[in-house]
Curated annotation (Swiss-Prot):
Gene Ontology annotations for the cellular component aspect, listed alphabetically: peptidoglycan-based cell wall; plasma membrane
Name of the protein in its database record: Galactan 5-O-arabinofuranosyltransferase
Species whose genome carries this gene: Mycobacterium tuberculosis (strain ATCC 25618 / H37Rv)
InterPro entries: ArabinofuranosylTrfase_AftA_C, ArabinofuranosylTrfase_AftA_N
Family: Belongs to the glycosyltransferase 85 family.
Catalytic reactions of this protein: Adds an alpha-D-arabinofuranosyl group from trans,octacis-decaprenylphospho-beta-D-arabinofuranose at the 5-O-position of the eighth, tenth and twelfth galactofuranose unit of the galactofuranan chain of [beta-D-galactofuranosyl-(1->5)-beta-D-galactofuranosyl-(1->6)]14-beta-D-galactofuranosyl-(1->5)-beta-D-galactofuranosyl-(1->4)-alpha-L-rhamnopyranosyl-(1->3)-N-acetyl-alpha-D-glucosaminyl-diphospho-trans,octacis-decaprenol
Recorded metabolic or biological pathway in which this protein acts: Cell wall biogenesis; cell wall polysaccharide biosynthesis
Name of the top EC class for this enzyme: transferase
Domain of life: Bacteria
Annotated transmembrane regions: 25-45, 66-86, 97-117, 180-200, 205-225, 229-249, 255-272, 276-293, 309-329, 355-375, 384-404, 420-440, 445-465
Regulation of catalytic or functional activity: Not inhibited by the anti-tuberculosis drug ethambutol (EMB).
EC number of the protein: 2.4.2.46
Record topological domains on the Extracellular side: 466-643
Length: 643
């Protein structure tokens, strides 16, 4: 339950956030805004500086890793110095500014330096990063909320991160695929800086530095390939502490924290569905635990946390509706397909509980320390209570996800593993501080020794992050970018023909890209250019309103057609806007091929790839323009025929 006795490291409990005093709230908001500005400034300057140098590729040279380590050590040493300045009461405003600069710089150097010789982000333009880049491309082409692939549909996937990145790309005139890397790194730097402000509003500044850099390092190691999820992940620990204290406050106290919790959940609802669902689940658990513990004090006392929960929910729903309402209204009147739902995924990690505190590693050690601290302090410390409930919620969510397989779905619990690690590492940082304080009473030399051990551990973990991310970094260098180049300077792949394909489509159709529907199995083409797709990458990322399974059936049926007349008649009868551009590959026996996907959950892998062969005779007609471009076959239905 909320703290009755403060633990040593939990100084001015909850600061402005649990107080409704307007001045303190305004100060807190000002500091949050300053954190965003500082993070953006640091990221932009740093990334521009890195981009000015022609670096060797990360997979074939250790230079970028070496420079990453130097930058990380400099940032961590600087944070130690800033903590020392603060502890001795010197230059405190400058110390806060320096803290924001250095945690932002730590984030940028950890990812920006290893990616310095490529324009692509982690995992390049492959698999999941294809659809993410496609979404960013769509929302660069238009500020309207639209589906990433299907014409005329509202978005199902939360657009928040992609919309802001798209607006930045449009404002600067940068291709969306090229904006992905700087926006990903900048957005995570923003999240880390905001997390620092949230922590220093609740605990002593030097401890806030420690908790922030520890959680940031784990986030960068295990969540950074999905940058919008990483942002929510690093903000979850301070927001859970804030929410726990707000729900547990009495009388007129804590309402600023309640509002803050609602705003955070609403923001998360526009950012990442799974984490807002987990966050809401955790907040409900908090409210129920508080209500149950207060039953002996009367109904009014027990109902108060539930009323606060209702306020949190109302605020979150109001904010979340800005992006979810168009989809919900459309889904209320149009058929929705659950075939290929995003929840149809059960890897081995989702079939077992994970216990990072039992790993024989540096991460395992800090997680074990955090676990012990949670057990000891959960009832006496608000941070411990909040983080403990967050950890328990992950395990409960995982068990519910396993049970959900009986209903032929899952809750994607394996994606909460980075969240679990971040929560335990935050607890471990608190436990480390408390252990040092307890041992420090026995001698003055304990604190310098602990500082040295902590700094060494932070450097050891941080310098290993590029190795943790090495597979994703390698793909960022081996994939071909939108300019037809690879980061490792080796011969590019077939994507180098995309500019010629784009030029041919625009020449024949005479239309803007956002007026053309393309059927292709080379989905990275849609990641680089904002054409609409007739069919998505996989059923799991397809908008349920798009009826992926029915579209797949229609495409498969075309393999049985023999003439162009039959094919054009079939296209014109489609219940959706038909494709006018077909980007295919050559097949055997006078055919063109498309390699498509089918949902086969609960099997693993959960997607089966299959090939659809279309006879060349379907396109051997004056109503089509057919052209070979590299390994591709581009067939375009002439505008007067598709009108």
């Amino acid at each position: 339950m909320p703290s009755r006795r403060k633990s040593p490291q939990f100084g001015h409990e909850m600061g402005a956030f649990t107080s409704a005093r307007a001045r303190e709230v305004l100060v807190a908001l000002g500091q949050l805004a300053a954190a965003v500005v500082v993070a953006v400034g640091v990221a932009v300057v740093s990334l521009l500086a890195i981009a000015r140098v022609e670096w060797p590729a990360f997979p074939s040279s250790n230079q970028l890793h070496a420079l990453t380590t130097v930058g990380q050590v400099g940032c961590l040493a600087g944070l130690v110095g800033i903590g020392w300045l603060w502890r001795h009461g010197r230059f405190r405003r400058l110390a806060r500014l320096g803290g924001l600069v250095l945690v932002s710089a730590f984030t940028v150097v950890t990812l920006g330096m290893p990616l310095g010789a490529t324009k692509l982000y982690l995992f390049g333009i492959s698999v999941d990063q294809q659809f993410r880049t496609e979404y960013l491309t769509r929302l660069t082409d238009t500020a309207a909320l639209r589906d990433m692939t299907y014409i005329g549909l509202p978005p199902f996937y939360p657009p928040g991160w992609f919309w802001i990145g798209g607006r930045a790309a449009a404002l600067t005139g940068t291709p969306a695929w090229e904006m992905f890397k700087p926006w990903a790194i900048t957005s995570m730097a923003i999240a880390v800086a905001v997390a620092l402000v949230l922590w220093w509003r609740m605990i002593r500044f030097e401890y806030a530095l420690l908790v922030t850099v520890a959680t940031a390092a784990v986030m960068l190691a295990y969540s950074s390939p999905e940058p919008y999820a990483a942002m929510i992940t690093v903000l979850l620990p301070p927001m859970l502490v804030l929410t726990w204290s707000g729900l547990g406050a009495r009388d007129r106290q804590g309402w600023a924290a309640v509002v803050g919790a609602g705003v955070f959940l609403g923001f998360a609802a526009t950012w990442y569905t799974l984490l807002v669902a987990y966050g809401a689940f955790t907040v409900v658990l908090m409210a129920l635990l508080l209500a149950g513990s207060r039953l002996q004090s009367g109904i009014k006392a027990a109902v108060d946390p539930l009323c606060r929960l209702a306020v949190v929910g109302a605020i979150a729903a109001a904010i979340g509706s800005t992006t979810w309402l168009p989809y919900l209204l459309r889904a209320a009147r149009d058929p929705v397909s659950d075939t290929g739902s995003a929840q149809h995924y059960l890897p081995a990690d989702g079939a077992a509980l994970t216990f990072p505190m039992l790993q024989f590693s540096l991460l395992g050690a800090i997680c074990l320390l955090g676990t012990l601290w949670l057990v000891m302090r959960a009832r006496s410390s608000a941070p411990a209570g909040a983080l403990a409930i967050g950890v328990l919620a992950v395990y409960l969510w995982s068990l519910l996800s396993m049970l959900a397989t009986l209903a032929r779905t899952t809750l994607l619990s394996f994606r909460l593993q980075p969240t679990l690690s971040v929560l335990l590492v935050a607890a471990g940082a608190f436990g480390f501080v408390e252990a040092v304080q307890a041992l420090g009473k026995r001698g003055r030399g304990v604190i310098p020794m602990a500082a040295a051990i902590g700094l060494a551990g932070a450097i050891a973990f941080s310098q290993d992050i590029p190795d943790v991310l090495r597979p994703d970094l390698t793909i960022a260098y081996t994939d071909t970018d939108g300019y037809g180049q690879r980061g490792d300077r080796r011969p590019p792949g077939s994507e180098k023909y995309y500019p010629a394909i784009d030029a041919a489509i625009r020449r024949v159709t005479g239309k803007r890209r956002d007026r053309t529907v393309v059927l292709t199995a080379d989905y990275s083409f849609l990641s680089y250019y904002p054409y609409w797709g007739f069919q998505g990458l996989t059923p799991h990322y397809a908008n349920p309103l798009a009826q992926f399974d029915k579209r797949a059936t229609q495409i498969d049926s075309w393999s049985g057609l023999s003439t162009a007349d039959e094919f054009i008649a079939a296209l014109d009868k489609l219940p959706w806007q038909p494709p006018t551009v077909f980007l295919m590959r050559h097949g055997a026996h006078n055919s063109y091929t498309l390699r498509l996907a089918q949902d086969v959950y609960p099997n693993q892998p959960n997607v089966r790839r299959y090939t659809v062969d279309l006879r060349t005779a379907l396109f051997a007609d004056p109503r089509f323009v057919v052209e070979d471009i590299g390994p591709f076959v581009l067939a375009i239905r002439k505008p007067q025929e598709s009108a």
